[in-house]
Amino acid sequence: VLCCEGNGGYPEIGTPWVPLERGYSVLGWNHPGFGESTGLPFPEKEQNAVEACFLFAVHRLHFQPSQIFVLGWSIGGYTASWIAMNYPDIAGLSKKLSVFSNYFKNEVLDATFDNIDELSRRVAPSIFDPVLESVVKMYLDLNNLSHVINYDGPVLIIRRSDDEVISTGDDHSRATNRGNHLLIGLLKHRYVKAYNSCSIK
C-alpha cells in the first residue's frame, strides 16, 4: 500500500498504520518540504514524489502494479488519484482508509474533494476571488475529479459528517461537503444515460 498523507499528516504517525495493522506491506512518503523531505509541495513536485515512490515499489521492491493499492487521505487524494490516472493497472486507490480493509478491492475516496477552487474561496474575502482563481489555476490546480474520471477502476466514496476542512459552509454540513461534487462528477461521467434520464442532486 502506497500511502499519501493529508496536509497535517506524516507517514510515521498517519495513514500507514491502518494497512500495516492489517498485514499489508506499506510504503509512506513525505510531501516535498515536509518532515525531512526537501523541496516545495507544488502539484508537479507532489506528482514527481509519489511517482518516484511508486516506481521504487515496482522496480526495486519488485511489486507488480496490480499488487499495489494507493491510499490517500484528504489532500493526499490528489497524488493518490494522479497515480491511479497514470497507472490504471494498480490494484486500487483509497483516499483515507478508516477501518475497512475489505474495501481494498475498490478505489476508496474518503475525506477528499473534487477540486480546490471553492475551498480556496473560504479563506479570503470575496473581493479576492479573481486573484485566488488565477493563483489556484496557475500554481495549485488540485483537481481530483479530473483524475478520478480518468480511472476506470471501482470506486467507493466515503464522506465524513461534520468535516470542517472540505466543507464550504460555516456549519460544516454534509450538504456543503466537496466530496458530494466529487461523487456527482463521477456519476455524470460513468453513467451518462442514467444521469440524463433522472435528476442527481
Q: What kind of region is each of these model predictions?
A:
Residues 1-23, 30, 34-36:
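Short, surface-exposed "cap/lid" segments of acyl-processing enzymes
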Residues 31, 109-112, 160:
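Active-site loop/turn elements of alpha/beta-hydrolase fold enzymes
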Residues 38-41, 168:
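Conserved catalytic-core motifs of eukaryotic protein kinase domains, centered on the activation segment
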Residues 40-62:
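Alpha/beta-hydrolase active-site loop
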Residues 67-123:
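Primarily recognizes the serine-hydrolase "nucleophile elbow" in alpha/beta-hydrolase
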Residues 201:
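Catalytic active-site module of serine/aspartate enzymes centered on a nucleophile-bearing elbow/loop
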